[in-house]
């Protein structure tokens, strides 16, 4: 059996730009991409915490150290500057590998400062 697993996640990054007329994509600070193990041109899913919209695009490298999160092209209709996003990429693998898989998760504050890195999402308590 093949499973699709979370590969990397940027948790609660803030949109710094939204450019309807830029070639479609999402520009992400290179430091953020590396922290989550997301490659340039990799497919990503974006979950807008602010407005509830969910959409797919691909990652492009933003200037290293700039803290840029720029939603571009048609996707700019789905996010405004200041919106809080979760950006995720996924990987497929055999069931045996998936059972011990650990994603790369980067957590951010409201100013796109990376606060911590983790290899799991915490267990949700009741």
Curated annotation (Swiss-Prot):
Reaction catalysed by this enzyme: L-aspartate + H(+) = beta-alanine + CO2
Modification Pyruvic acid (Ser), positions: 25
Protein origin, superkingdom: Bacteria
Cofactor binding description: Binds 1 pyruvoyl group covalently per subunit.
CC cofactor: pyruvate
GO function term, MF aspect, one: aspartate 1-decarboxylase activity
Similarity comment: Belongs to the PanD family.
Binding, substrate: 57, 73-75
Keyword Lyase appears in the UniProt entry: yes
Cited NCBIfam families: panD
SUPFAM superfamilies: ADC-like (SSF50692)
Post-translational modification: Is synthesized initially as an inactive proenzyme, which is activated by self-cleavage at a specific serine bond to produce a beta-subunit with a hydroxyl group at its C-terminus and an alpha-subunit with a pyruvoyl group at its N-terminus.
Gene3D superfamilies attached to this UniProt entry: 2.40.40.20
Pathway membership, UniProt: Cofactor biosynthesis; (R)-pantothenate biosynthesis; beta-alanine from L-aspartate: step 1/1
Function: Catalyzes the pyruvoyl-dependent decarboxylation of aspartate to produce beta-alanine.
Secretion signal span: none
Compartments in which it is found: Cytoplasm
Annotated PANTHER family: ASPARTATE 1-DECARBOXYLASE (PTHR21012:SF0)
Gene label: panD
Protein known as: Aspartate 1-decarboxylase
Catalytic residues of the enzyme: 25 (schiff-base intermediate with substrate), 58 (proton donor)
EC number in record: 4.1.1.11
Source species: Cronobacter sakazakii (strain ATCC BAA-894)
Swiss-Prot/TrEMBL keywords: Autocatalytic cleavage, Cytoplasm, Decarboxylase, Lyase, Pantothenate biosynthesis, Pyruvate, Schiff base, Zymogen
CDD domains: Asp_decarbox (cd06919)
């Amino acid at each position: 059996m093949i499973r699709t697993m979370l590969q990397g996640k940027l948790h609660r990054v803030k949109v710094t730009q939204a450019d309807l007329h830029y070639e479609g994509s999402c520009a992400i600070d290179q430091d953020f991409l590396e922290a989550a193990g997301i490659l340039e041109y990799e497919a990503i899913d974006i979950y807008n915490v602010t407005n509830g919209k969910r959409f797919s695009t691909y990652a492009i490298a933003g200037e290293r150290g700039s803290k840029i999160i720029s939603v571009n092209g048609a996707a700019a209709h789905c996010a405004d500057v200041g919106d809080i996003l979760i950006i995720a990429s996924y990987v497929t693998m055999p069931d045996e590998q998936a059972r011990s898989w650990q994603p790369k998760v980067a957590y951010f504050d409201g100013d796109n400062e990376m606060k911590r890195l983790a290899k799991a999402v915490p267990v949700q308590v009741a």
